[in-house]
Amino acid sequence: MPAYHPSQTPQAADNGLDDYIGMNQAAKSAAPGFMEKEFMPTLLDAYSIAVKNALSIVLAILLWILTLWIPYINIGTTIALCTMPLALSRNKPISPTFIFDKRYRQFFGEFFLTGGLMLAGVLAGALFCGFPAIVILISWSLAPMLVLDKGCNASEALTLSNKYTYGNKFLIFILFLALLVSLGVLLGIFGFILGAIADALGFIAILLAIILIPATGVGLIAAIYKRLVYQNSSPS
């Protein structure tokens, strides 16, 4: 496996992981309100990513659970799992075993520092009737992926995430609500149809829900990251 070089470009990479780990690409962001015109394309893209990668996402989660007890290995797998939307945002299929790539472990210091700062910020926001916690969570939601994607430290990642989501936080919140409602409706209709055919088929709807709920959630984060980060204007 090739060594990691921060100055390496995606074009010179030898495998898919190099395309989205530590490439130090120039920071880019969308304009405030950008997600308004991208609302439906983002939602549809989330479903597209989820359908294409649902099995890989679920298997990766299962592999993470099965290996969570292994010291040191669990550091890399946890980082890989938490930043999975970064891989999916490049429109490339993923393998469930990608979580075992050793290069994820080299980011553990900045990643967990970023996570700790995010948790502290959300808890502080929760003291003020809860709503600020949601704002902070959305504002900093891209930070863990930015640590890997841009090779920045925790402070820089949080700052960049806030800039990328500026002016789009409310629409991101509505996107998650829309995903939750639409997925609930789709699963409800599917379950009703199966139940009308035979009561025993209801487990298929439950199985589908177990697969699609995490897959669509990860897919939406990937679709949002794709649109907010990979744009032409620099964050200000």
Task: Give the ranges of each region predicted by the language model.
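A short amphipathic helical element positioned immediately N-terminal to and/or at the very start
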Residues: 31-52, 95-105, 155-166
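Hydrophobic alpha-helical transmembrane segments of multi-pass membrane transport/permease proteins
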Residues: 56-74, 174-187
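Residue-level signature of transmembrane alpha-helical entry/exit and packing/kink sites
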Residues: 56-57, 107-111, 172, 199, ...
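Selective recognition of hydrophobic, aromatic-rich stretches within alpha-helical transmembrane segments
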Residues: 22, 64-94, 122-159, 195-233
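Membrane-interface helix starts
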Residues: 48-62, 108, 166-174
